[in-house]
């Protein structure tokens, strides 16, 4: 008999928070993005680096004291220096970076940065990225009070070509 034991995490997923309360305030989302950047940076700095590949509000728990916990490492993988591409294409539609489903190359830390950018967009707008029109509309079109700087950060995270994104979480954290 096989038993799987998992930690109980008190709190709610960020997806549930957005469902219940709608788009979240910019200052709160920036704090959450910084926390998630530090988590991803930690994973990417392991030897070998760990690529999470499934960042989305449903996989982030908000604990009562305001800290976040990333859950569901089911499709995380080690980055393989000698590999030209991933063996399987996995990810959540709308949140997954293009390289996750096009089979063009190996996912790396820039893949997680893309997913984080989409997650931040969702938290600020309340719009699921897998809904029509299947593209990220600038956040200021949803709420003109949101900052243009944060809009540029999201756009930099979610560039189609990984070479045009932030190259690591330190760069993103600095801009946040």
Model-assigned labels for residue ranges:
Residues 14-24:
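AlphaC helix of the protein kinase catalytic domain
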Residues 38-50:
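Protein kinase catalytic-loop region centered on the HRD/HxD motif
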Residues 94-176:
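C-terminal lobe helix-coil module of Hanks-type protein kinase domains
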Residues 1-13:
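Conserved short submotifs of the Hanks-type protein kinase catalytic core
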Residues 62-66:
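Activation-loop N-terminal segment of eukaryotic-like protein kinases
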Residues 68, 80-90:
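Regulatory activation segment
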Residues 32-33:
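Activation segment signature within eukaryotic-like protein kinase domains
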